[in-house]
A protein has these predicted regions:
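Histidine- and/or cysteine-centered catalytic micro-motif in compact active-site loops
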Residues: 349-351, 389-392, 424, 454-456
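Residue-level structural signal for beta-strand termini and adjacent loop
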Residues: 254-256, 390-392, 490-492
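Short linear motifs in exposed loops
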Residues: 231, 388, 488-490
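Short loop/turn microsegments at loop-to-beta-strand junctions
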Residues: 372-374, 474-475
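Active-site bordering "gate/hinge" segments
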Residues: 17-371, 380-383, 396, 446-447, ...
Length: 562
């Protein structure tokens, strides 16, 4: 099961340093020297030879500020270095990362470890740690390959006999991304003022304001000659407010602001105005009726549509899912076939840094296997064209297209970066709304639904469970066909299965917008973006959302005692 969360950060512009800086870099020097030494030494140290060795070192700094009810709630700073080792033995055709049937796909892959290394940047200390961890990884790889051979001897042949790994050319790139710290004292005061504003309402049970920023530089070196250093800066300002209805349903509103500099964050006045809007929406939600299960026409506003595409199609076009024996392989044999409306084109391009001035969180230059990021055409005019690929080949797709991703400590698999949906025929949003009403009348439905805002979603692609998706709306309206005003409603989740749902898209607006988020799957949490216009879906199914049985607080918050 994979989850998509609302963004907590965005990409900032890097400061690229000269090549002379690379020669002085103790991290790069330690990684390269120990890689060369280890690869030469381990290559024929055992009967099963080492054929590939890669290191990824992530050096990060993080700061987080939070305020609640007019007081500073958290102020923390962290530094960390994480080393991941990709160790492969035998041959590309069959190696220690091969799926052991009966295990989860990633449980049999021990190529990657989440390991702390010396913080000081001392080359000798770094090499000692790298040597220690590489030795352990080599022994584990040998052990795992023995399990692979035994498993293959007693299980049925795979449907897709593609190799476990594919070659990639050597890459050389060096940049150091630095982050200038903001005026923390000023931000502490600003957060306290923002948070005090939300404390003035008795129906708000919890609220808060946060700002966080992170500086991250990644080193990628491997036995094929790749030497890459690249980095990102991430920053966000966000607020949230929650309440609970008398029937136990948790409600929330909020906003997050992604920018490429602290100067680019909205003014205090703009944030206060947005808070006032969110407060009014939360109050209205408390009195809104619950929607009964429904199947019929609906509009997904642009950001909500981005999450929808991420869940119903994005994960199912990740290449390794077409090969894994326990995967549903929904689209594995549909390349060249029509899978959705003729107006829909879908691609993923991690090289995009922004869309109409909005930074894209899914941007990266090189993936976690040292392959340069590439634009990948997935669907063209409704026809499936390809898959997102890491260096694990599948039938008909022998090479990576730069989409191998992971968070530290987990094996790399194919993942989305910046998923973009484009429509060849569009209308204005008011025209799309008119098409919704017309479709409702055609189907004899008294109303349709409009999904304004979402919190994320999740999907399942394994054969062991229902291969369905769920998207979690936050703000939904009924649009009536008889001219009554739109009505805010609550308590619904969007559900469905991918092949049917993807085929029901019938029209799109010209209001493309960005959803920035963080996606969780078997290779961990990675930053992603989706770009999409609002879309009309001729048939969308919703079910009642989960809720607690807990009543609202007996007493009002203490700030409201009279």
């Amino acid at each position: 099961m994979f989850k998509l969360l609302l963004s907590l950060s965005v990409l900032l512009s890097p400061a690229v340093l000269s090549a002379s800086e690379e020669a002085k870099d103790p991290y790069m020097n330690a990684l390269v020297k120990e890689l060369d030494r280890s690869f030469a030494g381990f290559r024929n140290a055992e009967k099963t030879p080492l054929y590939y060795l890669g290191y990824e070192l992530t050096v990060s700094k993080y700061h987080y500020l939070s305020a609640k009810f007019g007081a500073l709630d958290a102020d923390s700073e962290q530094r960390g270095n994480k080393l991941d080792i990709d160790m492969r033995v035998n041959t590309m055709g069959l190696d220690n990362t091969h799926q052991v049937k009966g295990n989860m796909a990633w449980a049999s892959s021990t190529q990657s470890q989440d390991l702390p290394v010396a913080l000081e940047g001392d080359e000798n200390a770094l090499r000692a740690r790298i040597w220690e961890y590489t030795d352990k990884a080599f022994k584990k790889a040998q052990e795992n390959f023995t399990k692979v051979k035994m498993n293959k001897a007693v299980t049925a042949a795979e449907d897709d006999p593609s190799p476990d790994f594919s070659p990639a050319g050597a890459e050389n790139f060096y940049e150091t991304v630095e982050l200038q710290a903001p005026d923390l004292a000023a931000w502490r005061e600003r957060l306290k003022k923002h948070s005090a504003r939300m404390a003035g309402y008795s129906f708000i049970y919890d609220s808060g304001v946060t700002v966080s920023y992170e500086n991250e530089n990644r080193y990628l070196v491997n036995s094929e000659g790749t030497r890459v250093k690249t980095g990102n800066n991430y920053i966000t300002l966000t607020y949230y407010l929650t309440s609970r209805t008398t029937d136990g349903m948790e409600l929330s509103r909020g906003e997050h602001y992604n920018t490429d500099s602290f100067a680019g964050l909205p003014s205090a006045g703009k944030v206060d105005a947005d808070m006032d809007r969110s407060i009014a929406e939360l109050k209205a939600l408390k009195d809104a009726p619950v929607v009964e299960p429904y199947s019929g026409p609906a509009i997904l506003k642009a950001r909500a549509a981005g999450v929808y595409f991420h869940e119903i199609i994005g994960h199912r076009l990740e290449g390794h899912r077409q090969k894994l024996e326990d995967s549903g392989q929904t689209f594995a044999k549909k390349v060249g076939q029509k899978v959705t409306s003729d107006i829909i084109t879908l691609y993923d391009d991690p090289n995009l840094t922004e869309f109409r001035g909005v930074p894209l969180r899914g941007h990266y230059r090189y993936d976690d296997e040292g392959v340069k990021a590439r634009r990948v055409s997935l669907v063209e005019n409704g026809v499936l064209k390809g898959f997102l690929m890491n260096r694990s080949p599948i039938r008909g797709f022998a090479a990576s297209n730069g989409h191998g991703r992971r968070s530290s400590g987990l094996p790399t698999v194919a993942r989305m970066g910046n998923l973009v949906m484009k429509a060849s025929v569009t209308s204005t949003y008011p025209e799309l709304r008119g098409q919704l009403i017309a479709e409702c009348r055609k189907q004899n439905k008294p109303f349709g639904l409009v999904f304004e805002d979402i919190s994320g979603g999740f999907t399942n692609t394994n054969r062991g469970g229902a291969q369905a998706f769920k998207v979690l709306p936050l703000l939904v309206y009924k649009v009536y066909t008889d001219g009554r005003p739109d009505e805010m409603v609550r308590g619904v989740d969007i559900v469905g299965t991918p092949i049917t749902s993807f085929s029901k898209i019938s029209a799109a607006a010209d209001d493309d917008a960005v959803f920035n988020g963080t996606c969780g799957a078997e290779s961990g949490w990675v930053p992603v973006s989706s770009v999409s216009p609002s879309v009309l879906i001729s048939e969308l199914e919703v079910e009642k959302s989960e809720k607690s049985q807990e009543k609202p607080p007996v007493l009002e918050p203490p700030l409201h005692d009279k």
